[in-house]
Amino acid sequence: MFTDTNTQKPSTPTHALDVRRVESYVQTDVLLFTEKKWRTNTMAEQEVKLMKGNEALAHAAIRCGVDGYFGYPITPQTEIIETLAEEKPWETTGMVVVQAESEVASINMVYGGGGCGKKVMTSSSSPGVALMQEGISYMAGAGVPGLIVDVQRGGPGLGTIQPSQSDYFQATRGGGNGDYYVIVLAPNSVQEMADFVDLSFTLSFKYRIPAMILSDGVIGQMMEKVVLPPMKPRRTEEEIIKECPWASTGRVGMRDPLVITSLELKPEIMEVRNLRLQEKYRQIKANEVRYETKFMEDAEYMIVAFGSAARIAEKTIELARAEGIKVGLFRPITLWPFPEKEIKEAAKNLKGILVAEINAGMMIEDVRLAVDGAVKCAHYGRLGGIVPEPEEMVKALKEEFK
């Protein structure tokens, strides 16, 4: 069951976008959008494929009208740039694909392309995304949209090439300097790897804020059936000028320059810019929370998990219920904004919450803040690239809440 915060009713995962005013840093911009939905085409129009999560994301980028990809190879996300190179979208849609000299170069190319109103993206894995944090902070400060894909691996440092979820803090707390956030979507299937590309760009341009797809080595490398989105043409220059009046497009007839920058030397103006940024974040928190619940109708306990850990949690629930333990699942889809009100509501009549992560305990801090001591919260996780087994989670449930 998908639920959105606009209706508080079960729904398909879709948000309709209308003309909405979003505060810029020095002026109010009117962002123009048409209604967008996920997977609304019929089966006859859909193209079903069997592929890896990384491959599905690359195909979705081509089909969603992305203008450019700039990236650097790193396991376990290299299939993204490999697939784009194999598909040669520059010959069909005109999409630019560049293997940059580094992750630092990649994110700054995204900064430049996004500042021109283009739909541009990059992808990397944990240590590579760490190198991108300066550029992401600059994009957030300048109000530049763009997509960053993080297919997580174990750390710290160079770590391992095995899957992990240890980038949670880096993604949800604004990994660079300054008071900022990025929208973070956590897929738990190959289908969502494809679906979240268009959704990420929609939200990123709606609010002029970077968006991140926080995946991991399990989701990136696993193969599943996926319904690819229909082909959508890239926007014309005229459409970009109309939809992105803030963008630096070099258009003729403009007497006042459009400057894309995060720099402001006057503190009183910088404070105003920051206050407007915080107001934008409040709007996002109010309107863009997404999550999924399962087996919660009669649940006495709840597992909170995201990404691949949520897939494992579903099997855990099956095993636990076979033993008479009534447990349900709460899966945050947006890690930022985090569904804290929804978790608090779901926890009202519970005996305990187990937060399952492939890390030492990160999301559990947000869950504890959400329930505010009303119910016991325990954590179970594995480290170093080890993926937890469902039987281990069942054992943790019994030990923590016996």
Predicted features by range, described:
Residues 3-7, 16-19, 26, 30, ...:
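Short hydrophobic alpha-helical segments enriched in small aliphatic residues
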Residues 208-293:
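Conformationally flexible catalytic loops at phosphate/diphosphate-handling active centers
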Residues 291-325, 330, 336-342:
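Redox- and metal-dependent alpha/beta enzyme cores, enriched for Fe-S-associated oxidoreductases
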Residues 357-402:
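Peripheral docking tails and interdomain loops at the edges
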